[in-house]
Amino acid sequence: MIRALLLSTLVAGALSCGVPTYPPQLSRVVGGEDARPNSWPWQVSLQYSSSGQWRHTCGGSLIEQNWVLTAAHCISSSRTYRVVVGRQSLSTVESGSLTIAVSKSVIHEKWNSNQLAQGNDIALLKLASSVPLTDKIQLGCLPAAGTILPNNYVCYVTGWGRLQSNGALPDILQQGKLLVVDYATCSNPSWWGSTVKTNMICAGGDGVTSSCNGDSGGPLNCQAANRQWQVHGIVSFGSSLGCNYYRKPSVFTRVSNYNDWISSVIENN
């Protein structure tokens, strides 16, 4: 029964998640752009303590009131973390935003930092306290288990990652339109080849828009037919040649491959 309840709250069946009070403004701007404030209300900034300051390192998605979904490669056992929710500007303490300590991190047991191409780049962060849901802080939905998006499906990556290779980190949350690249194409030798696995999603590769350093762990947001946004991907890796590289789309952990793992972690922790 507990497991069934967890699945019912996490998976995109109920409209209690994935429907922002302030819907995102989806323009046709090429490249990234400032997101409408609070239009991705499950987006979090994962920050670590360093020399008395808190520094943004990765993104994440609030999927339960005390659980955040992020990438395994974002987590180091030697660091102390917190998450910031309900925020548009990282430098401003905004009304309605909250900062919560991370009490526990659970990294996928098959994740190997020396074998990024094997996938399983997924982690869950348990928060020290539950986050109250408001018009600025809402839960992200998970897609149904096994869901595979078709080629050219429109999604949006969000985060505070660099605007370009070796570029500046933005203060304002960014959004970028990415088209899904199906596995048959992305695994072609002239694209990512065997580096890409079926537990991943490719999106982008147009040489213009991509995720970049600082976006890691954040969501690939894709809208379902019922207008509900679902977190289909977790920003995992890009090309060593740089961000926005042609035929080297951003690679995401495919969330729909890990529904059972997510439910099990939450149930047992």
From Swiss-Prot:
The active site is at 73 (charge relay system), 121 (charge relay system), 216 (charge relay system). It comes from the Eukaryota. Belongs to the peptidase S1 family. Elastase subfamily. CDD domains: Tryp_SPc (cd00190). Interacts with CPA1. Interacts with SERPINA1. Disulfide bonds join 58-74, 155-222, 186-202, 212-243. PANTHER family: CHYMOTRYPSIN-LIKE ELASTASE FAMILY MEMBER, CHYMOTRYPSIN-LIKE ELASTASE FAMILY MEMBER 2B. GO terms for molecular function: endopeptidase activity; serine-type endopeptidase activity. Elastase that enhances insulin signaling and might have a physiologic role in cellular glucose metabolism. Circulates in plasma and reduces platelet hyperactivation, triggers both insulin secretion and degradation, and increases insulin sensitivity. This is Chymotrypsin-like elastase family member 2A. It catalyses: Preferential cleavage: Leu-|-Xaa, Met-|-Xaa and Phe-|-Xaa. Hydrolyzes elastin. Residues 17-28 form a propeptide. Its EC number is 3.4.21.71. Residues 29-267 form the Peptidase S1 domain. SUPFAM superfamilies: Trypsin-like serine proteases. GO terms for biological process: insulin catabolic process; proteolysis; regulation of insulin secretion; regulation of platelet aggregation; response to insulin. Keywords: Disulfide bond, Hydrolase, Protease, Secreted, Serine protease, Signal, Zymogen. Pancreas. GO terms for cellular component: extracellular region; extracellular space. The gene is CELA2A. Residues 1-16 form the signal peptide. It is found in: Secreted. Its main location: secreted.
